[in-house]
């Protein structure tokens, strides 16, 4: 899976009230169903495996404490996701269930203990386990009748999958006819379709050159390659298959899991060579550690190891519980670390001129994702110094050419957690942090001050909007959803227009159509008459803009959406705001005092406004833009609404409007929206997933509303 999902709750399950548990159970159920669909149907996971496991762990813990919440369609009772509808459906004769997870050695000991108790074994009875790496690929069931492959189906929701027979026939690891004699009439062989890391990198290079989809990780590329309507596309992709299980069998050719693995090999299948027979908990844990040590060296992704009771008659006695077998478990790996070489360090310049050093890595798989870039934060971080002056990595600095250890803790953004000094080459290069901006202007770089007036760790270019790097980032902000929100003008299009010299400042966006007779945009690759017409219509639709959005779109430092709204409400019109800004820039004490008196406006914002409007270049940008755009007066908050002057906090997931919409509506009706609950809070609007803020509301005696009650209160 891909990126992480931050947990929306902080209350321990043991501390949840029944009402809180019910709300969170519903939210987690919906979230898990969504991620199952993205993973199993669309091959486009939005969170990492570790983050998904954490969600499911919490969900299961809630159901364990409140068993009355469990329902037939609960994610704890189902597997995967329903077939997508792109392929013919196939009913599994024997359901394809998933394994329960173990995250700690204690979980493995509990697993073995449960089996011994269930089978009523004596203390000296030994249980043999077949242990194997857990391949991170796409589960597949292959049905053979009379030794011939007749159907290949994906897992789907465990009961029903998708027919991908034509595509599976293109895999060299899948025999069309089983080898050997005296084969059972019906054999269902199950295993994992995967793509090697090397093949994945090569495929992405070809995809990039062809302008096609770039896959996030080998698992996604394997799934996407297999679920093609055209089998020739699948045939062109280097997919492998490991056999490790079975489904419907008219006769069993072996009495043990390990015996079945050998039989798969005799039939012509590839099995994982690291599979091993273990006879104790200690051997299982040693196997897990050994595989984890080899993980980075393997040419395919794994996310844990699997333990299965070896004796098939014991597997049958143990049976299943809900969606998982009692006889098997997946022992997952912790947040993955990987070693790689830092090839270079590049500087990225942000919209406000902030410098961010980015490490360029030899591509390496971490947590199911190929990582090539890593943020190095700032100059001090590279030197081994933290934001508060603390020592990082025992003071080891980061040099170009170093072997570094990177980690996706919780599988979030990769970070450098260590530098291997013993692997440092003699020619490792100390990174010289630039004192001039890398832009053509080569303007000076300064270190920002902290709130205490001390030198901070963040470096910034002083070129402002004359700096082309800042220009392009400002243009991206200007067209973004929270500013002018111009449909069809995303970051990619802005970059293209900027590189071509067609859009250098915001006003240029509104003159594109006028200049198109010369530009001939419809002749540019990727555009046509219809798309160009749609773009121009979208631009025209933004010729009128709310004052707060306009102020935000100017991109002044420290002026985010909330501050922009406060300024818009404080001055009411563009004319009044513009006049005040010019006076503030000229040091007019009365104007400065008036701005300082506004709600949520302080010295930092005033300095930023003064600096912005004190520059001739910026005033020119604003003047040219206001010739193209009509700026609407700020909407005055309704003072007669039931929430006028009230303080509102939103928490949890809102289902009938986005958080931004709810915030905007509340502010339009005269309320103040806060991010935390205090004695001054009037209402907490709680949706599914509401966590600690509900407890805070109870502590302070604040009224809690559901989303429906909130909408009823405001009359919407």
Curated annotation (Swiss-Prot):
Q: Which keywords fit this entry according to its UniProt record?
A: DNA damage, DNA repair, DNA replication, Ligase, Magnesium, Manganese, Metal-binding, NAD, Zinc
Per its UniProt record, the required cofactor names are:
Mg(2+); Mn(2+)
* Pfam short name (any one): BRCT
Q: Does the keyword Ligase apply?
A: yes
**Could you say which residues bind NAD(+) here?**
49-53, 98-99, 132, 155, 192, 308, 332
> What SUPFAM superfamilies is this protein classified in?
BRCT domain (SSF52113), DNA ligase/mRNA capping enzyme, catalytic domain (SSF56091), Nucleic acid-binding proteins (SSF50249), RuvA domain 2-like (SSF47781)
Domain of life of the organism encoding this protein: Bacteria
Q: What is its EC number?
A: 6.5.1.2
One Gene Ontology biological process: DNA repair
Taxonomic classification: Bacteria, Pseudomonadati, Pseudomonadota, Alphaproteobacteria, Hyphomicrobiales
The gene name on file is ligA
A single GO molecular function, which one?
Answer: metal ion binding
Which CDD domains would you find in this protein's record?
BRCT_DNA_ligase_like, LIGANc
Sites where the protein binds Zn(2+):
437, 439, 461, 467
Provenance organism: Bradyrhizobium sp. (strain ORS 278)
The family assignment reads: Belongs to the NAD-dependent DNA ligase family. LigA subfamily.
The active site consists of 134 (n6-amp-lysine intermediate)
Domain named BRCT: which ranges?
638-716
Q: Would you tell me the protein name for this molecule? A: DNA ligase
Q: Which PROSITE patterns match?
A: BRCT, DNA_LIGASE_N1
A GO cellular component annotated for this chain's UniProt record is: cytosol
Catalytic reaction list: NAD(+) + (deoxyribonucleotide)n-3'-hydroxyl + 5'-phospho-(deoxyribonucleotide)m = (deoxyribonucleotide)n+m + AMP + beta-nicotinamide D-nucleotide
Checking InterPro entries in the record gives:
BRCT_dom, BRCT_dom_sf, DisA/LigA_HHH, DNA_ligase, DNA_ligase_AS, DNAligase_adenylation, DNAligase_N, NA-bd_OB-fold
Role description: DNA ligase that catalyzes the formation of phosphodiester linkages between 5'-phosphoryl and 3'-hydroxyl groups in double-stranded DNA using NAD as a coenzyme and as the energy source for the reaction. It is essential for DNA replication and repair of damaged DNA.
């Amino acid at each position: 899976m891909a990126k992480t999902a931050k947990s929306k709750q902080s209350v321990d399950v043991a501390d949840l009230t029944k009402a809180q548990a019910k709300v969170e159970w519903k939210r987690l159920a919906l979230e898990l169903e969504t991620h199952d669909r993205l993973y199993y149907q669309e091959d486009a996971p939005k969170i990492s495996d570790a983050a998904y496991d954490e969600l499911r762990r919490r969900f299961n813990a809630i159901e364990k404490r409140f068993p009355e919440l469990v329902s037939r369609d609960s994610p704890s009772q189902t597997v995967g996701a329903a077939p997508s509808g792109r392929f013919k459906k196939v009913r599994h004769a024997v359901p394809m269930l998933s394994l329960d997870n173990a995250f700690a050695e204690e979980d493995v000991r509990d697993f073995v203990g449960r089996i011994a108790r269930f089978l009523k074994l004596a203390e000296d009875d030994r249980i043999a386990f077949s242990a194997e790496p857990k391949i991170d690929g796409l589960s597949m069931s292959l049905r053979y009748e009379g030794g011939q492959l007749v159907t290949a189906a994906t897992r789907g929701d465990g009961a029903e999958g998708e027919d991908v027979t034509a595509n599976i026939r293109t895999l060299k690891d899948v025999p069309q006819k089983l080898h050997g004699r005296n084969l059972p009439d019906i054999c269902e062989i199950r295993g994992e379709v995967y793509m090697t890391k090397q093949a994945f990198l090569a495929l992405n290079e070809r995809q990039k050159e062809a302008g096609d989809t770039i896959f996030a990780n080998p698992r996604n590329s394997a799934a996407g390659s297999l679920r093609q309507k055209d089998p020739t596309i699948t045939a062109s992709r280097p997919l492998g298959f490991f056999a490790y299980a079975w489904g419907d069998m008219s006769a069993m050719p072996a009495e043990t899991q390990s015996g079945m693995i050998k039989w798969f090999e005799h039939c012509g299948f590839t099995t994982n060579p690291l599979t091993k027979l273990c006879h104790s908990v200690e051997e299982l844990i040693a196997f897990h550690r050994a595989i984890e040590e080899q993980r980075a060296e393997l040419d395919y992704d794994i996310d844990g190891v699997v333990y299965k009771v070896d004796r098939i008659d014991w597997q049958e006695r143990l049976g299943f519980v809900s969606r998982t077998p009692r006889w098997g478990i997946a022992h997952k790996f912790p947040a993955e670390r990987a070693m790689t070489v830092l090839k270079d360090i590049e500087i990225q310049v942000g919209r406000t001129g902030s410098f961010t050093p980015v490490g360029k890595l030899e591509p390496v798989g971490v947590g199911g994702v190929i990582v090539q870039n890593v943020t190095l934060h700032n100059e001090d971080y590279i030197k081994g110094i933290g934001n508060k002056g603390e020592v990082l990595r025992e003071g080891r600095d980061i040099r170009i050419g170093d072997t570094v250890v990177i980690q996706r803790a919780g599988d979030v953004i990769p970070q450098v957690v260590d530098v291997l000094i013993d692997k440092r080459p003699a020619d490792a290069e100390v990174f010289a942090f630039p004192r001039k901006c890398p832009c053509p202007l080569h303007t000076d770089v300064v270190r920002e001050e902290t709130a205490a007036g001390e030198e901070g760790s963040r470096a910034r270019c002083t070129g402002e909007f004359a700096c082309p790097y800042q220009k392009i980032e400002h243009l991206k902000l200007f067209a973004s959803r929270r500013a002018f929100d111009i449909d069809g003008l995303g970051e990619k299009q802005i970059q293209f227009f900027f590189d071509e010299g067609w859009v250098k400042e915001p006003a240029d966006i509104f003159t594109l159509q006028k200049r198109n007779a010369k530009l001939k945009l419809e002749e540019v690759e990727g555009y046509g008459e219809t798309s160009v017409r749609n773009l121009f219509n979208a631009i025209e639709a933004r010729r009128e803009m709310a004052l707060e959005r306009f102020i935000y779109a100017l991109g002044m430092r420290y002026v985010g959406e909330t501050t922009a709204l406060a300024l818009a409400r404080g001055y009411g019109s563009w004319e009044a705001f513009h006049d005040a800004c010019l006076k503030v820039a000229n040091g007019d004490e009365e104007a400065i005092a008036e701005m300082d008196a506004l709600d949520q406006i302080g010295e930092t914002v005033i300095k930023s406004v003064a600096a912005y409007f004190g520059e001739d270049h910026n005033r020119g940008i604003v003047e040219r833009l206001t010739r193209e755009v009509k700026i609407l007066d700020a909407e005055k908050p309704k003072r007669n609404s039931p929430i006028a002057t009230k303080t509102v906090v939103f928490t949890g997931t809102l289902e009938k409007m986005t958080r931004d919409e709810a915030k905007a509506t509340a502010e339009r009706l005269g309320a103040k929206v806060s991010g935390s609950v205090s004695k001054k809070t009037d209402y907490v609007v709680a949706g599914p997933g509401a966590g600690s803020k509900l407890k805070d509301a109870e502590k302070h005696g604040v009224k809690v509303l559901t989303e429906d009650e909130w909408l009823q209160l405001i009359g919407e």
